[in-house]
Amino acid sequence: MSLSDHGRKLHICVDFLLPRISPNISVSLRSIEIDMLGHYYSYLDQMRHLTNDWLIIPGHDWPYFGGGVRAVDLIEHHDKRLDLLRGAAANGPITTAGAMHALFTFDLTDHELFFASCEARAHLNHLVARNEMQIQTEDGIEYFYPG
């Protein structure tokens, strides 16, 4: 959820349009199949039209101007992440764990591991929603194939 005041050109974005980092876009463990990244792309598509005179108030860091530019940066960031997964799946089917290794090339703490797995799955779900990947379950493990 975010709030906008068009008269004052003020947008309170909570964690969705942070100035320095990409927010964690994750699936819910209760609804693992939902395309959360698709929802986020829709939000960013709306925000990319903000002019530079809008004041953005995030839930972390400091207020800033340039929310439209930041939205485009975040779209490009997630596009690159999707490209990494397309490349990983080109060599054979990948699991959510395989997607995590493609997206996060550094050692993860236990806390980071949870968020990384949910974010990796959100990116895989988006590729499925775009019909760029298919899911096949074998022995209780979900594999993601190009297609």
Question: Which residues make up each language-model segment?
Answer:
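Metallo-beta-lactamase
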Residues: 1-82
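C-terminal regulatory/interaction regions
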Residues: 84-147
